[in-house]
């Protein structure tokens, strides 16, 4: 029944910038899922019709293009350099909080399901830890459990393939030598 279903996209102002949110499902009364993509920069909104096939019968799914990603990037292209400087974990956590608040206002639900994939699991789990009162549950896919180990592992792999003595090698070594024991957002 098309009258019960939903397929729309919007650009609400979230944390001071236009951010792309796409909402799809066959019944607006189904539980709402906010999907947080990986990357950063790994939007799935363009292929969600494939990835969510079947799920949209049971859930209403909101896909969000994070700051400096795909449609959010293009909606703010004139401010992209300025926005790139604001991409901290705290900015992403605030974005998630404001998107949930926006979705709550527009779609009139009590709580939603938060689902994070890869990088999205890092910011999604942190949001869930801070704001469980807004969630039915949190689902992590490809959950990052130790961000530092993940970054250092990747950097060590990079050192094996980038040219020795290059500026890229210097940058990667700098990351290895200066990456904090605990991320600044991990206070517990």
Map each language-model feature to its residues:
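Conserved acidic catalytic loop of the alpha/beta-hydrolase fold
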Residues: 90-111
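Conserved hydrolase catalytic core segment
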Residues: 109-149
């Amino acid at each position: 029944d098309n009258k019960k279903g939903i397929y729309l996209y919007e650009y609400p102002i979230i944390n001071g910038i236009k951010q792309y949110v796409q909402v799809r499902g066959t019944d607006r009364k189904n539980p709402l899922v906010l999907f947080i993509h990986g990357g950063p920069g790994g939007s799935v909104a363009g292929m969600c019709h494939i990835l969510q096939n079947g799920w949209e019968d049971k859930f209403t799914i909101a896909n969000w293009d994070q700051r400096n990603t795909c449609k959010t990037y293009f909606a703010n292209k004139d401010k992209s350099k300025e926005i790139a400087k604001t991409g901290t974990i705290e900015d992403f956590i605030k974005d998630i909080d404001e998107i949930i608040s926006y979705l709550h206002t527009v779609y009139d639900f009590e709580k939603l399901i938060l689902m994070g994939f890869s990088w999205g699991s890092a910011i999604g789990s942190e949001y869930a830890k801070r704001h469980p009162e807004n969630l039915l549950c949190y689902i992590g896919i490809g959950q990052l459990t130790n961000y530092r180990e993940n970054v250092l592992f990747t950097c060590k792999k990079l050192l094996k393939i980038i040219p020795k003595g290059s500026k890229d090698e210097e940058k990667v070594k700098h990351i290895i030598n200066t990456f904090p024991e605990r991320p600044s957002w991990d206070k517990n």
